[in-house]
Amino acid sequence: MPSSSDTALGGGGGLSWAEKKLEERRKRRRFLSPQQPPLLLPLLQPQLLQPPPPPPPLLFLAAPGTAAAAAAAAAASSSCFSPGPPLEVKRLARGKRRAGGRQKRRRGPRAGQEAEKRRVFSLPQPQQDGGGGASSGGGVTPLVEYEDVSSQSEQGLLLGGASAATAATAAGGTGGSGGSPASSSGTQRRGEGSERRPRRDRRSSSGRSKDRHREHRRRDGQRGGGEASKSRSRHGHGGEERAEAGKSGSSSSSGGRRKSASATSSSSSSRKDRDPKAHRSRTKSSKEPPSAYKEPPKAYREDKTEPKAYRRRQRSLSPLGGRDDSPVSHRASQSLRNRKSPSPAGGGSSPYSRRLARSPSPYSRRRSPSYSRHSSYERGGDVSPSPYSSSSWRRSRSPYSPVIRRSAKSRSRSPYSSRHSRSRSRHRLSRSRSRHSSISPSTLTLKSSLAAELNKNKKARAAEAARAAEAAKAAEAAKAAEAAAKAAKAASTSTPTKGNTETGASASQTNHVKDVKKLKTEHAPSPSSGGTLKNDKAKTKPPLQVTKVDNNLIVDKATKKAVVVGKESKSAATKEEPVSLKEKTKPLTPSIGAKEKEQHVALVTSTLPPLPLPPMLPEDKDADSLRGNISVKAVKKEVEKKLRCLLADLPLPPELPGGDDLSKSPEEKKTATQLHNKRRPKICGPRFGEIKEKDIDWGKRCVDKFDIIGIIGEGTYGQVYKARDKDTGEMVALKKVRLDNEKEGFPITAIREIKILRQLTHQSIINMKEIVTDKEDALDFKKDKGAFYLVFEYMDHDLMGLLESGLVHFNENHIKSFMRQLMEGLDYCHKKNFLHRDIKCSNILLNNRGQIKLADFGLARLYSSEESRPYTNKVITLWYRPPELLLGEERYTPAIDVWSCGCILGELFTKKPIFQANQELAQLELISRICGSPCPAVWPDVIKLPYFNTMKPKKQYRRKLREEFVFIPAAALDLFDYMLALDPSKRCTAEQALQCEFLRDVEPSKMPPPDLPLWQDCHELWSKKRRRQKQMGMTDDVSTVKAPRKDLSLGMDDSRTSTPQSVLPSSQLKPQGNSNAAPVKTGPGQQLNHSELAILLNLLQSKTSVNMADFVQVLNIKVNSETQQQLNKINLPAGILATGEKQTDPSTPQQESSKPLGGIQPSQNMQPKVEPDAAQAAVQSAFAVLLTQLIKAQQSKQKDVLLEERENGSGHEAPLQLRPPPEPATPASGQDDLIQHQDMRLLELTPEPDRPRILPPDQRPPEPPEPPPVTEEDLDYRTENQHVPTTSSSLTDPHAGVKAALLQLLAQHQPQDDPKRESGIDYQAGDTYVPSSDYKDNFGSSSFSSAPYVSNDGLGSASAPPLERRSFMGNSDIQSLDNYSTTSSHSGGPPQPSAFSESFPSSVAGYGDIYLNTGPMLFSGDKDHRFEYSHGPIAVLANSSDPSTGPESTHPLPAKMHNYNYGGSLQETPGGHGLMHGQTWTSPAQGPGYSQGYRGHISTSAGRGRGRGLPY
């Protein structure tokens, strides 16, 4: 019967697959469609009810029929035996047993169950059938019927016929171990391919038998719940044996074997093998069926419920009986049969191979995919490779969706656990379960491209393994048969031939590895693998599966060692194997690669040496098989053999916690299981030695290794953070690379940056230390869309932040050092053929040691001069973009970077970007005005550029660069001119720049660093926030503080007191030098009477925190709603209030002293300015009044108070007081310097104390935690003149701090009050900084507003103040400030400058400076001040030289000139002051600082004020 059915179904051993398929399809059509319905229902029922006995009669009944009838009958009988037979019938009909097997797997657990039942029953059947071919053949039909409806529907009857036959042959390894004549590898491949076809075929056929299948599934699901589990246990044993046999058959890949062997040697060998097996199986059927039913249910139940179930199943492989004897013997007989059949028939035991091949071939096929083994073992061997499992999953899911089980076990790993649970449920419910399980991994695998590739590799590997197995089968077949016989006899465990074993092992090992992973996850809960193994033994099915794997391993062992030790050793191996497989699989699965194998080997080896027991060999084999699946199977087999030997030495892996890093102790496994559940999916992590590399597999370090301190920047693909390395305590910058919104994975800019920075190693180029992630696990990373972090060395500042802050003044030597380092780094890049393409001030980093580093290589690219390919011209920030890019050049050269560096050189001198436009056309226009219009006369190739005709300037300009930047030192100007050549071919190179006179002999290492703000890291982001806050009219305390550095005290205080005074801050910065003029201001106008002053003091003292709005109310100051809101946000800290009295008083004393000094008040007012900008205007007015009276009343107190406040660190006042130490050289200059000092102190002290008084620290943007220490330079520059006046004032008044703030406000307010209001309007219009009209009016409006640069409003409106200024000498200063802000203002002032510095004491100068500062305070950076740089009158410089002498007295006017602008040009021309005003582009606060410096009297403040505010 079997042979006839096989022949009929298979079309004869010699028939080609296509022919066999056709025949099988025809037969199926004829017999399956009519017979299947009755057979399926009755077969299923009998199978469930009478597992062993009914099948034989049915088989016999099936046998008598014609080949087709026999096939149908066999299907019926086998179906009676188990759900499997129908599949076998299909296989016979299709002649595609492998495909059938795969289809069965796909079809679901039922298919597997049926196969198992067939196996279990076919064991007895062999004798009954004699060949068992009929049973296997018959089994095909039920398989079709039992297959999921989806699978059936998918497989048409036609497709189902051929592919089902193929599947039947494949699945029913017994029914013609080779469904096709093709070699096992070919069969397996076909099986895989055919399995897919069969899926469709079966789907179509199942479409016909959908109802039947559904009914059968339902019945199976119900009965199969119990019986199916029994049959599964049988299947688990017999099925696994079949699977092994199928593996052997498929691996032997002798289709003839399956067919002819099934017919001939099948009957003989199968009878021989089956006889022992039959007796055993009969015993099992009578005894085992119940136990199988009992045990399989347990295994299934336990497996379903617990991971242990898998282990139990594995164990139950050996336990299959108490069935160890019967199952083991069964297995042994099966393995012997498999081995025998392979050797005799060359195809393996045909009947057994059919049975074994049927279930085994499905298994092997399923396993061949690499998921199959594990899944098949755990799921009764039905688990098919991922491909199959996917189809079976779907099918079984739709009818019997074992989703519940799947979900239950999916926990371990959705794919693996689901496989197990699904395979179990599907064993019961449908054959597809094995496929199901495979599918779950495959689906999971397929979810990622990596998984898909791995899946492909698995299939290819399985095919290769099958081929290798086939090749080895012939040689090993005999050995395997003998070894199998010996092993079967000795161990009474069925082991497939080594070829089969290895083919199946390799294929199923992959599956097994995955299954093992599942098992690990599931088993992990059990503390000891041994216990788990015992449980597995208790569960027959898993043991069967495990036994298969073990048998495969054992077969290899047998081949190597001849025979494994006994059933005990086998069972031990099985137990160990599942455990080690589980353990190893976890790591192996992740590391399904050579590393895994090596690691496993190493781990196992390390563990093995102490463990001499050979039983471990199966595990090793499995591990090896897994590894083999991964690597070349021949190599894998050898490795596996070696591992096996090592494993044989190893005792139970569970007991050996150290045995495997990969396979840890059960408890460790549990943890590992959980960890591995996460780690297994680690797609990104190293796949090898997952456990071994636990700590390093996902990356040695995670972002958790850093303490993130704050954000310091925003890049193109994420934020930049300042962080501290927890291990080394080193400061680093973390550049975040977010993958969230990245459509194409990792950002190309980040890839380029990483790639390029790894090739650039230079002291002037930022160093990338490492790359870390924000996830410790690849699974989490994939799930949550993690981020990468590029770890760079930390740099304290960038040039943009420093220039805009106004806190630093760079002299010519500093600029030389910076440019030397910059050009060295750029020359290095260009010599390495890299273009940076994004050089700008914010990408030039600076640390506190004065080291310059080029950063942000996200736009950089490799450059090839020989290469003519075009590059994008949309590179380089617009302000630094060279004319060739603006005109559309795409074949540019490194000259583009040199242009950017030339822009930076000019910016270092002018303190502001030299070409500021917001559109390309406007940018080109600006360049043309300074550098001349691009024309063929100067730039012959310009006519070739794409946009030359469309973008050329409307009018022709001549080159005026040297005239515009005449204030730059000659050597620097030469280089500047050379670097800004329009024609890129005439532009200097980085190397030539290093050889120019300006940079030739510069040694940056020997040059002292500039006086950098150690209390504040000045970065672009900080600077932008600061500027934004000022524009919003809010006090940017931090910014103010920094600005104060530029502004020194005034800028800081202004910002703090009322950012609205943003103008004031600028003026404050200047006023530091000009603060002398401020006192007069305070006088005018709003002076608080004693009662008002008392109220103010009481207010300050009485409240723990004072709201600026309250201040305004108390002072009866009118404020607009916007300013009011800003003021409401501003609270003075209790500390400030505590010193509030002092502050208020000191302010008054300061004001008083300032008034006498004439320059102190402005500085003091400036200091109050540090308060919120919005509040500043209002507060300034209020303070102006308060300070006026306070100053009058308490000049002497002021000095004391200021000193006290300095000590107390109370706000603006204290810093001012600190400044006092340097006493004014002259009342005017002294006051001016003192004011500057006070401003400095305010900046330094104010950051903490003053600001708190004026603004709560929380409201201030980043500020130095402590007030910046007073720098001698700054103090001297700003305070020399101011020293004495401020000191005495502040010392005298206990409220000096408050008074200083008030004085500053008053100084601004009063001067602003008279002219202020005029100017205030302008200021308000021009600048958002001005919250209060007073402040705005004062000077702020014009100087702060961008207008200052552009408009004379500040000065014009200040023109009224200039009167005051003149009286204070502030007029000249104002003009100088105005020069910064506007040329017109200078015009008024230039005559006065001399008078200003001379006739007007520092106070006047200070006031003027305040005005000037206010101007610079304007964010000139917001405007294009390039063309206004000539505004500044030289007179201001000259004037300022006197007053500025205080601050700059230390630095002669020349030094001032060195202050970049005015050093050369401020004195020389108003342009210098204009430049100084331009400085304000950086920020109002900055402007003031520089403005003071730029003012002649305060060179430091002027330098700072001009920093960027310098017009040019």
UniProtKB/Swiss-Prot annotation:
The active site is at D838 (proton acceptor). The modification Phosphothreonine is found at T589, T872, T1059, T1246. Residues 129-140 have a biased composition (Gly residues). It catalyses: [DNA-directed RNA polymerase] + ATP = phospho-[DNA-directed RNA polymerase] + ADP + H(+); L-seryl-[protein] + ATP = O-phospho-L-seryl-[protein] + ADP + H(+); L-threonyl-[protein] + ATP = O-phospho-L-threonyl-[protein] + ADP + H(+). GO terms for cellular component: cyclin/CDK positive transcription elongation factor complex; nuclear cyclin-dependent protein kinase holoenzyme complex; nuclear speck; nucleus. Keywords: Acetylation, ATP-binding, Isopeptide bond, Kinase, mRNA processing, mRNA splicing, Nucleotide-binding, Nucleus, Phosphoprotein, Serine/threonine-protein kinase, Transferase, Ubl conjugation. Residues 189-198, 295-309, 512-523, 567-586, 661-671, 1044-1056, 1201-1210, 1311-1320 have a biased composition (Basic and acidic residues). Its main location: nucleus. Residues 1-60, 75-547, 567-597, 655-677, 1026-1085, 1139-1173, 1201-1231, 1245-1273, 1309-1334, 1353-1400, 1483-1512 are annotated as: Disordered. Residues 160-171, 246-269, 350-374, 384-402, 463-491 have a biased composition (Low complexity). Residues 92-109, 210-220, 419-436 have a biased composition (Basic residues). Residues 49-58, 1254-1270 have a biased composition (Pro residues). One of its GO terms (molecular function) is RNA polymerase II CTD heptapeptide repeat kinase activity. The modification N6-acetyllysine is found at K557. ATP binds at I712, G713, E714, G715, T716, Y717, G718, Q719, V720, K735. The keyword Methyltransferase does not apply. Interacts with CCNK, CCNL1 and CCNL2. Interacts with C1QBP. Cyclin-dependent kinase which displays CTD kinase activity and is required for RNA splicing. Has CTD kinase activity by hyperphosphorylating the C-terminal heptapeptide repeat domain (CTD) of the largest RNA polymerase II subunit RPB1, thereby acting as a key regulator of transcription elongation. Required for RNA splicing, probably by phosphorylating SRSF1/SF2. Required during hematopoiesis. This is Cyclin-dependent kinase 13. The gene is CDK13.
